[in-house]
């Protein structure tokens, strides 16, 4: 339940794509799927094409009026209100400030979701494991390709 915060200028599709590019630049190798609500910013063609066609990331949508389908996200949004109360204007907020808040949120243990572990620690462990699997997969794929080429000779 790692939290990443990216400042979005507006809900316009071009601003969402720009914000997602920053997110993907930072965390792309760790992203396999996205589950979004049904906000207009997540259903624009520009955003859909960028995420699904260009990045090849599966995008899922929660059922309307079913916030429980994104329970962890709703919980983290409530926690974010400790730093930015509802109604706060993000006009003067800088990305650096959001990075600091995300770092603090990721350092706090999550009793239910992670059995008291800190999201940053779990994220790092999972990311390292994922990289090992990815390297093993690439080696296996390369070996199979070489075997196929040898069989063709």
Where are these regions (language model features)?
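Short small-residue beta-strand/loop micro-motif enriched in glycine and branched aliphatics
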Residues: 1-6, 61, 86
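Short acidic/glycine-rich loop or secondary-structure boundary segments that cap or lie
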Residues: 3, 15, 42-45
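Active-site beta-loop-alpha junctions of metal-dependent nucleic acid enzymes
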Residues: 5-28
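Short catalytic-loop micro-motif centered on adjacent basic/acidic residues
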Residues: 5-6, 33-37
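Active/binding-pocket-proximal capping segment
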Residues: 11-12, 22, 50-57
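Loop/turn elements at helix/coil->beta-strand transitions in domains of secreted/extracellular proteins
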Residues: 29-30, 57-58
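RNase H-like two-metal-ion nuclease catalytic core shared by retroviral integrases
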Residues: 36-38, 45-52, 59-82, 91-103
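C-terminal domain-tail junction helix/linker
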Residues: 86-153
């Amino acid at each position: 339940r790692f939290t990443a915060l990216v400042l979005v200028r507006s809900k316009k599709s071009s601003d969402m794509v720009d914000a997602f590019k920053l997110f993907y630049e930072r965390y792309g190798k760790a992203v396999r799927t996205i589950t979004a609500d049904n906000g207009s910013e997540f259903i624009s063609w520009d955003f859909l094409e960028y995420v699904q066609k260009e990045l090849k990331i599966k995008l899922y949508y929660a059922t309307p009026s079913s916030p429980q389908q994104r329970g962890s996200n709703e919980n983290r949004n409530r926690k974010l209100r400790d730093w930015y109360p509802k109604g706060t204007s993000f006009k003067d907020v800088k990305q650096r400030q959001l990075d600091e808040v995300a770092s603090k949120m990721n350092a706090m243990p999550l009793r239910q979701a992670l059995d008291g572990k800190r999201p940053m620690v779990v994220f790092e462990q999972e990311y390292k494991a994922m990289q090992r699997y990815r390297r093993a997969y690439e080696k296996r794929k390369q070996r199979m390709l070489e075997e196929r080429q040898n069989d063709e000779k």
